[in-house]
């Protein structure tokens, strides 16, 4: 029995974008970055949090079970009869969610053991065997829960499951290094090379991320590293931005894989459920960014695979972005 515990805010089955084959993605809670385009804001803080979907609330007149349960007095009744949450008072205790029949109130983030997580993961073991899939740890940031991540990966490997992580690289190198013996694939985010722009977008500079990436490439097989850049208007959306990252990677090795991810706003509604304001609702892409994004989206629709950086194998989109623009 493996009793090591960690904070998990979601377990997503049948994932096809988080590594080879069909996978189960385990999302670990807690992240040092505050990316303005984060699609999982419920994974930023390392503690259980309340997500409240007011549209699902039955209303205090027909229900109201939650109102007397809150020990902090964070719940009241709005003008439309639905419950209103004062998130400044909420501690995420879960008393309201326990009695909510419509699941308008939900606690995200709970402490789980390695065995509890793998019990969910192994339910789809037959699909992993046929597709070459397995378990992927994501977040949040995996490196924030290094001991739990290592225990999960080690036990998954012992049970014959394929293993992968998705990381920003924002963590201590010894933590990342400790995971390597138990990993088949690493997805590594490099959002932006410009230090100050990275700080403005994520809250922190990228020195540690790039330093850890260089160390990783020195000790881990390049063909098992997939570098990802989520396309973000105002951050890395121009041809020059993407080309700079491509050239940086080629300076390390042509056998790395590079994946450009189209811009999306999937996580925007979650901010409201957490009582937060989405930080990027007003972002409007420039004409150049819109053109690059349109080409990227068309390319991704045709080719789902990752893109080798080798000129001999390079994909049309990436090669086009590498070429100097006409003046």
Task: Give residue ranges: language-model regions.
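Extended, non-globular alpha-helical segments
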Residues: 52-58, 109-124
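Short glycine-enriched, charge-decorated loop/helix-capping segments at active-site entrances
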Residues: 52-55, 199-205, 274-283
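Conserved AdoMet/S-adenosylmethionine-binding subsite of the radical SAM
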Residues: 115-266, 270-272
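Hydrophobic packing within well-folded, soluble alpha/beta domains
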Residues: 35, 90-96, 100, 156, ...
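Auxiliary Fe-S-binding modules of radical SAM enzymes
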Residues: 1-20, 222, 233-327
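N-terminal pre-triad scaffold of radical SAM enzymes
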Residues: 8-62, 83-92
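Iron-sulfur cluster-binding cysteine motifs and their immediate structural context
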Residues: 36-43, 64-85, 95-111
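General zinc-binding finger modules coordinated by cysteine/histidine
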Residues: 59-61, 65-68, 116
């Amino acid at each position: 029995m493996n009793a090591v515990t960690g904070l998990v805010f979601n377990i997503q089955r049948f994932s096809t974008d988080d590594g080879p084959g069909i996978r189960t993605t385990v999302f670990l809670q807690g992240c040092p970055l505050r990316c303005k385009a984060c699609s999982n804001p419920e994974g930023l803080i390392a503690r259980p949090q309340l997500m409240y979907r007011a549209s699902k609330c039955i209303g205090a007149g027909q229900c109201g079970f939650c109102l007397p349960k809150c020990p902090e007095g964070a719940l009241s009744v709005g003008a439309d009869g639905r419950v209103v949450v004062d998130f400044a008072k909420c501690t995420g205790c879960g008393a309201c969610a326990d009695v909510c029949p419509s699941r308008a109130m939900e606690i995200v983030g709970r402490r789980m053991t390695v065995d509890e997580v793998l019990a969910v993961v192994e339910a789809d073991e037959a699909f992993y065997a046929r597709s070459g899939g397995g378990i992927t740890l994501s977040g949040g940031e995996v490196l924030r829960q290094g001991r739990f991540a290592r225990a999960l990966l080690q036990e998954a490997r012992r049970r014959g499951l394929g293993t992968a992580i998705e990381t920003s690289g924002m963590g201590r190198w010894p933590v990342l290094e400790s995971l390597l013996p138990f990993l088949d694939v690493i997805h590594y985010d490099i959002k932006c090379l410009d230090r100050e722009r990275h700080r403005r977008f994520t809250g922190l500079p990228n020195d540690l991320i790039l330093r850890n990436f260089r160390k990783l490439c020195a000790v881990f097989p390049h063909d098992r590293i997939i570098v990802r850049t989520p396309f973000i208007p105002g951050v890395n959306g121009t041809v020059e931005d993407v080309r700079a990252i491509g050239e940086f990677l080629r300076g390390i090795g042509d056998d790395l894989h590079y994946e450009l991810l189209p811009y999306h706003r999937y996580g925007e509604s979650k901010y409201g459920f957490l009582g937060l304001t989405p930080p990027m609702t007003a972002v409007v892409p420039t004409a150049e960014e819109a053109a690059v994004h349109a080409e990227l989206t068309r390319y991704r629709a045709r080719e789902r695979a990752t893109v080798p950086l080798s000129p001999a194998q390079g994909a049309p989109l990436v090669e086009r972005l590498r070429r100097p623009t006409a003046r």
